[in-house]
Regions:
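Active-site neighborhoods and metal-handling regions in enzymes and metal-associated proteins
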Residues: 1-193
Length: 193
């Protein structure tokens, strides 16, 4: 666990530097989904013990952020402006472990519906972060707790809430997952290990 914490600390430094750079420069210098992805990777490469990205970075601007596993291409990458949202799903392999994080950056004015949806996601994350669960609790239970603020609005998202992360292996490491649909063999109880 200590190594995993170290990996996330290193990765968090790179992501924080990226966030500062993005907020300071959006609308002032040309940037698109590919260039911001490349810049974030360059920051990770400066971290001690960095090995490689843990998966291809997903950087989706505005409508592109809603497409699961979107892949920006140099010739079609959306240009970033000082408005709307940028979703970045990314991670790195470090000597101390593997990371996978998703962050949404508000780059400027957004609509009321975007504010409402963003707030529902924050509430969902807080639900999950604050839950106290007993030994043997499964991903299904945690997923439902996380989705509750979104379900209250008769909305949903089609992907799982979470997944196992390998240690310098596959970033989507089975069989553990957080999803509300039951899949035999893919929902092990959570145990300290």
């Amino acid at each position: 666990l200590e190594n995993t914490r170290k990996a996330h600390l290193l990765d968090g430094i790179a992501v924080t530097k990226f966030m500062y750079w993005l907020k300071k420069n959006v609308g002032k210098i040309p940037m698109d989904e590919v260039s911001v992805s490349d810049y974030l990777q360059s920051l990770r490469e400066q971290m001690e013990g960095y090995r490689d990205i843990s998966f291809d970075t997903i950087a989706g601007y505005n409508a592109n952020a809603a497409m699961m596993h979107y892949k920006a291409e140099p010739d079609t990458a959306a240009k970033l402006e000082p408005q709307g949202m940028l979703l970045v799903d990314s991670g790195g392999h470090y000597d101390t472990g593997t990371t996978d994080i998703t962050r949404t950056f508000v780059l400027g004015p957004i609509s009321d519906i975007q504010k409402k949806h963003f707030t529902m996601v924050v509430k969902s994350n807080l639900n999950l972060a604050n839950v106290k669960f007993l030994y043997g609790c499964s991903g299904i239970s945690l997923d439902v707790i996380c989705r509750e603020p979104i379900w209250k609005e008769n909305l949903d998202y089609q992907c799982g809430t979470g997944h196992g992360v390998g240690y310098l292996l596959n970033v989507h490491e089975g069989p553990n997952s957080f999803r509300w649909q039951y899949r035999p063999g893919f929902d092990n109880p959570f145990e300290a290990g």
